[in-house]
Swiss-Prot record:
Organism ancestry: Bacteria, Bacillati, Bacillota, Clostridia, Eubacteriales
Protein name in UniProt: Imidazolonepropionase
Note on cofactor: Binds 1 zinc or iron ion per subunit.
Role: Catalyzes the hydrolytic cleavage of the carbon-nitrogen bond in imidazolone-5-propanoate to yield N-formimidoyl-L-glutamate. It is the third step in the universal histidine degradation pathway.
Cofactor(s) essential for the protein: Zn(2+); Fe(3+)
Residues reported to bind Fe(3+): H82, H84, H253, D328
Pathway stated in the Swiss-Prot or TrEMBL entry: Amino-acid degradation; L-histidine degradation into L-glutamate; N-formimidoyl-L-glutamate from L-histidine: step 3/3
GO molecular function: imidazolonepropionase activity; iron ion binding; zinc ion binding
InterPro entries, A to Z: Amidohydro-rel (IPR006680), HutI (IPR005920), Metal-dep_hydrolase_composite (IPR011059), Metal_Hydrolase (IPR032466)
Enzyme Commission number(s): 3.5.2.7
Family: Belongs to the metallo-dependent hydrolases superfamily. HutI family.
Binding locations of 4-imidazolone-5-propanoate: R91, Y154, H187, E256, S333
UniProt-listed Gene3D superfamilies: Metal-dependent hydrolases (3.20.20.140), Urease, subunit C, domain 1 (2.30.40.10)
Amino acid sequence: MRPVDLLIVGAGELVTMAGGPRRGERMKDAAVIPGGALAARDGRIVAVGPEDEVLRTVETGPDTRVIDARGRAVIPGFVDPHTHLCFAGDRAEEFALRLGGATYQEIAARGGGILETVRATRAASQAELVELGLARLDQLALNGTTTVEVKSGYGLSLADELKQLRAIRAMARRHPLTVVPTFMGAHEVPPEYRSRREAYVDLLVEEMLPAVAAEPGLARFADVFTEAGVFSVAESRRILERAKALGFGVKVHADELSDLGGAALAAELGAISAEHLLHASDEALAKLAEAGTVAVCLPGTSFCLMNAPYARARRMIELGCTVALGSDYNPGSCPAYAMPFIITLACMHLGLNPSEALAAATINAAAAIGMEAEVGSLEVGKLADVVILSTPTHWHIPYHMGMGVVAKVVKRGRLIVDEGKVRRR
C-alpha cells in the first residue's frame, strides 16, 4: 500500500489520454477508463485505473484529500500552447472597427493592431504587467487550463521585451499554473524601425536574443511572425537560426494571412511547432508531419476576425500531422482564453470530434511546448494536473458550448479551483 495525499474517486469516466501525442486515427482514442480513479503524492500521479484496483494499492491518511467526482468526467488539465496574455490596455475600439467591416490588415496599416498594444505595454510598469497577468491566469485556471505558454512581443525594444519576459517570470513564480515563456521580439517591426527593417532584424539577432539567453529562466522558445508585411521567410530564418544557436526551441507564426512559406520554414528548421496555418499548402503540411513539427490550430482567432478562414485540421490529420489546439489569447485578434470554448470551435469549424479536440487541447498541446513527458495526460509519474468536469462525459464540453463545464481543477495535486474560486496558495 502506497500513502497518497490526493485521491479522486467516483468518476463517471476517467479520460487519461495515455500513450503519448496522437496522430491520425489515434486522436479518436481518449484512453477512457469507465469508473476510474486517480491517486497522487507530492504533486505527481502514483496510481490510475479502475477504482477498485486503485483503492487496493493506495493508503489514505488524515491529510489525504479525497475528492468524489460524483459520476462526472475527470480529464487532464488543459494545456494552452499559444497565448499573448502579458499585455496592457485593450483593443475594444478595434473590435468595433471589425464589426464595421475593417480587416486585420487595414487596422494594422492605420497604426492599430499589435502596435496599439505595444504602446500600452511600453507605458506599463513591470509590476502592473504582473498584476494584469496574474488576474488573467486566474481566468485560465477557472476554465481548466493548468499549463500555458506565454509570449512576449508587445515590447519590441530590448528594454521592453526584457520587462515583459521578467513580468512573465514573476507571474509564474506567484501563480500555481505552469507558465512556459516564449520570446517573440519578432512579433512586428516597431514604428521607430519601419524605415530600416534590416536594423531591427540586426537588433533581434545581435542584441535581443543574446540578452534573453543570458538571463536564466526568461524564455524557453523563440517565435517569429512570418507573414507578408511583417517578417519575410529569409528574415525569419536568420532570426530563428540565431535562436537555435543560442539554445532556444523555435516556433513560427506561419501562413496565417497568406501562403508565404512559414510552415515549410518551420519544418526545415525542425521547429517544435508551427501555429495558425490558415493558408498552409498540402505540401507544407506534409513537411510538418515529416519533421514532427506540431501543427497548432487557433480557431478562436478565425472566429474573432470573422472574415478569416479556419485552419484545415481535418486535412492536417489526414497528412499525418500532430494537431494541437491553442487559444491565441491576445487583446486584439482573440480576446478569448477558455479552452472549452476553443474545443467547441474546433468541433464546429475544424471538423474534429470531441475526443480529437480534447487530445489536441491536452497531450498534443503539451507536445507543442515540449511538455508531453510532464503534462497533458493522466499517467503514473506525471504531474497531477486534473480537471473534474460538471458533466458526465468529455463529449459534453462542446455540447455545452464550453460554458460552465469546469467544476474543480487540481494542479500538482492541489485543489486550486473549487466552486468558482481560485486558490493561488
